């Protein structure tokens, strides 16, 4: 796998809104690093040249014009690189040929996918191919689901260090989240709803928390679809709109790590609303509203000021032996754009540079990059993983 290539990774979708942010981050962080060779790829060479000029991309950085409707063009791009970083979603509409080409060619792949139906299909379709060729495919390398997947891993490592065993009851609690929701997330949800009309069997995939867990059927999971009072934290909590993908990814990570969290592991994610009547009212409001209704259109996004003023703070609670271990993951920019663009960039670098012993297959972030990626995110990307008690 990964014979001599021109590039460590290619940013596919570099002329889109999120792709430009990835490019901007790479220029800021790695333009003077000769050990990291990357290229920009997209459908229009003139637009690529414009992005390269506006973002001060170092001269000599590759610009690859790729026709997304031409398999030969896609394969030409894949042949030049060790890894494809793609921001072009919804992936069920625009990701099939890219991920298939990577799997068949033994090339690594990272994306921002939060589409469990499509992921389920690709896991079934491409796992054996990826294992044979050595391709490491890692879905969900943005806000869905890195802070949650790695947050649970970070928590379980601390619980196991203290008690010699993991917590089988973990709660993810979003304490703060400021920033515009991703237009790509909204578009992916729309594409999933459309796919359900053509493939009603996807309902079962979306409803099953273990649908990405390689056939494993775990215990009933705690409810997360209506407001509840979390008495251990003394607060009302509301349904969190990203829980349907994050929880599936966390359970997949557990399965891929030989059930490191236990076969009876339970996990849910909810949004902290506060105590008392005000907290209950806020939880009721959130549960009846659509947080994605005002999301930007795909290709659009928030201003630099909005991105830089955004942030998020997620608490993870692991119950064990009548105690509860608390850790947090905090991000320094808006989750859907600023932080996401940094997370996927660091994922590509980590996968190619620090995970050379990882076998081919289809992964989530925790079992593929794990603590190596946690360190990179803390050192470079503005994330903080903290033990709180």
What do the PLM-derived regions correspond to, one by one?
Residues 51-59:
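Short, conserved SAM-binding/catalytic segment
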Residues 8, 82-83, 108, 325:
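Structural motif
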Residues 31-47:
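Conserved glycine-rich Rossmann-like NAD(P)H-binding loop of the short-chain dehydrogenase/reductase
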Residues 90-211:
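Glycine-/Pro-rich loop/turn segments that contact NAD(P) or position catalytic residues
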Residues 19, 157-389:
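C-terminal catalytic/substrate-binding lobe primarily of soluble NAD(P)-dependent oxidoreductases
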Residues 25-35, 257-259:
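A short, Lys/Arg-enriched amphipathic alpha-helix followed by its capping loop at the start of a domain
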């Amino acid at each position: 796998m990964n014979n001599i290539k021109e590039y460590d990774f290619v940013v596919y979708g570099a002329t889109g809104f999120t792709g430009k942010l990835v490019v901007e981050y790479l220029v800021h962080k790695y333009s003077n690093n000769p050990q990291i060779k990357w290229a920009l790829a997209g459908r229009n060479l003139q637009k690529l040249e414009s992005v390269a000029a506006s973002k001060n991309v170092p001269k000599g950085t590759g610009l690859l014009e790729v026709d997304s409707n031409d398999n030969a063009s896609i394969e030409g791009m894949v042949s030049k690189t060790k890894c494809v970083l793609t921001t072009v979603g919804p992936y069920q509409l625009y990701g099939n040929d890219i991920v298939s080409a990577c799997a068949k060619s033994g090339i690594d792949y990272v994306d921002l996918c939060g589409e469990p139906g499509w992921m389920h299909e690709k896991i079934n379709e491409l796992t054996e191919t990826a294992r044979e060729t050595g391709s490491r495919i890692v879905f969900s390398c943005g806000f869905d689901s890195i802070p949650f997947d790695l947050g649970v891993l970070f928590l379980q490592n601390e619980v196991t260090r203290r008690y010699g065993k993991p917590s089988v009851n973990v709660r993810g609690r979003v304490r703060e989240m400021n920033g515009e929701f991703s237009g790509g997330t909204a578009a992916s949800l729309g594409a999933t709803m459309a796919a359900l009309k053509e493939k009603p069997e996807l309902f079962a995939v979306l409803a099953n928390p273990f649908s990405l867990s390689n056939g494993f059927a775990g215990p009933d999971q705690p409810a997360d679809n209506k407001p509840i009072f979390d008495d251990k934290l003394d607060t009302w909590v509301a349904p969190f709109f990203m829980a349907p993908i994050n929880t599936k990814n966390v359970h997949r990570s557990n399965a891929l790590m030989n059930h490191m969290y236990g076969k009876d592991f339970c996990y849910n994610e909810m949004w902290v609303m506060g105590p008392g009547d005000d907290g209950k009212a806020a939880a009721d409001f959130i549960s009846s509203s659509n947080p994605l209704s005002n999301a930007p259109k795909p290709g659009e996004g928030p201003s630099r000021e909005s991105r830089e003023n955004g942030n998020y703070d997620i608490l993870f609670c692991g119950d064990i032996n009548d105690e509860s271990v608390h850790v947090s993951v905090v991000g320094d920019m808006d989750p859907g754009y600023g932080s996401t663009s940094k997370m996927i960039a660091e994922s590509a670098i980590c996968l190619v540079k620090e995970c050379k012993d990882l076998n081919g297959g289809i992964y989530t972030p925790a079992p593929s990059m794990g603590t190596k990626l946690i360190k990179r995110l803390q050192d470079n990307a503005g994330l903080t993983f903290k033990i709180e008690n």
